[in-house]
UniProtKB/Swiss-Prot annotation:
Gene Ontology CC terms, in alphabetical order: cytoskeleton; intermediate filament
Protein name: Keratin, type I cuticular Ha3-I
Residues annotated as domain IF rod: 56-367
Region (Coil 2): 220-363
Organism: Pan troglodytes (Chimpanzee)
């Protein structure tokens, strides 16, 4: 906010410079508008000629108007300054608690989110460890299953080989039984043929000859055949018993192996079913944990995006407030400088008023015609007058109030 003091022209006019006695300091006067008033013109003329030239009333009226305008501007600036201070105080009281509260809530929310993130990370690590353990267990069970499957295949191949051997032995037994039956039939046929031939010979030779021969007794063929038959039957029976005993032993062993293999196979099948159920349950749990992790990651991403946008908004708000505060500070500094300038102007005006008041009080005195008489009159307070009447004003008492 800028203020214009409404002063007269700030530059020195030619009204001073047109006088032959005006010093160079008049062109660089420090008081705004000091060279524009008739009093300053009469000052130059007064120091040179020692008279008022009849413009005291006009000068006093002009000075009074200037003083009133300056005082009004000073009061206006003081009121504006007070209003600005109240406005700044109200804004600071309104905004500071809001910013602090919002920061505290954001910090609490960020800490809660960080705790949730840490808990989620630990839970994910625990689930990863459980998944790794389940994978190792499933690999172990898979290895056991493959081993037992290879053992089962070996046992099944052995059973198939024993079944082939059993079939061969069964065929062998049937062949031997068929051979025994054929031998029995052949033996029976031989017996019948032999009996028929013996009977035929007996019939032919029974009534014709009666020859007695002193020789060794004849061999009984029936007895020989019976002995041979009994020997063959005993041999066949022995072979049959041995084959049956061996077959029974092998069959019993195979049955035991088949029973044990079937029991192991059933136990393996039950274990495989349980392992499949466990693997399915672990896969379902793994998929659920993956979904939970994805949802948590999405939630975390959304929360980070939301809170980052909120933080950016808060940062922008803080930046705006800081820029406003900087502008307000700069305005306050500028107004303070203007206020100091106005105070200086006021002090100089008061000094000038006091000077003119002293001049008005001493206007009844007779002024001498000597140009330096007035300076000799005020020599009591300021010292001796200088030899140059048109020198710088700082050497004269009444003009020393301008601070030159």
């Amino acid at each position: 906010m800028s203020y214009s003091c409404g002063l007269p022209n700030l530059s020195c006019r030619t009204s001073c410079s047109s006088r032959p006695c005006v010093p160079p300091s008049c062109h660089g006067c420090t008081l705004p508008g000091a060279c524009n008033i008739p009093a300053n013109v009469s000052n130059c003329n007064w120091f040179c000629e020692g008279s008022f030239n009849g413009s005291e009333k006009e000068t006093m009226q002009f000075l009074n108007d200037r003083l009133a305008s300056y005082l009004e501007k000073v009061r206006q600036l003081e009121r504006d300054n007070a209003e600005l201070e109240n406005l700044i105080r109200e804004r600071s009281q309104q905004q500071e608690p809001l910013v602090c509260a919002s920061y505290q809530s954001y910090f609490k929310t960020i800490e809660e989110l960080q705790q949730k993130i840490l808990c989620t990370k630990s839970e994910n690590a625990r689930l990863v460890v459980q998944i790794d353990n389940a994978k190792l267990a499933s690999d172990d069970f898979r290895t056991k299953y493959e081993t037992e499957l290879s053992l089962r295949q070996l046992v099944e191949s052995d059973i198939n080989g024993l079944r082939r051997i059993l079939d061969e032995l069964t065929l062998c037994r049937s062949d031997l039984e068929a051979q025994v039956e054929s031998l029995k039939e052949e033996l029976l046929c031989l017996k019948q043929n032999h009996e028929q031939e013996v009977n035929t010979l007996r019939c032919q030779l029974g009534g014709r000859l009666n020859v007695e021969v002193d020789a060794a007794p004849a061999v009984d063929l029936n007895q020989v055949l019976n002995e041979t038959r009994s020997q063959y039957e005993a041999l066949v029976e022995t072979n049959r018993r041995e084959v049956e005993q061996w077959f029974a032993t092998q069959t019993e062993e195979l049955n035991k192996q088949v029973v044990s293999s079937s029991e192991q196979l059933q136990s393996y099948q039950v274990e495989i079913i349980e392992l499949r159920r466990t693997v399915n349950a672990l896969e379902i749990e793994l998929q659920a944990q993956h979904n939970l992790r994805d949802s948590l990651e999405n939630t975390l991403t959304e929360s980070e995006a939301r809170y980052s946008s909120q933080l950016s908004q808060v940062q922008r708000l803080i930046t705006n407030v800081e820029s406003q505060l900087a502008e307000i500070r700069s305005d306050l500094e500028r107004q303070n400088q203007e206020y100091q300038v106005l105070l200086d102007v006021r002090a100089r005006l008061e000094c000038e008023i006091n000077t003119y008041r002293s001049l008005l009080e001493s206007e009844d005195c007779k002024l001498p015609s000597n140009p330096c008489a007035i300076t000799n009159a005020c020599d009591k307070s300021t010292g001796p007058c200088i030899s140059n009447p048109c020198g710088p004003r700082a050497r004269c008492g009444p003009c020393n109030t301008f601070g030159y």
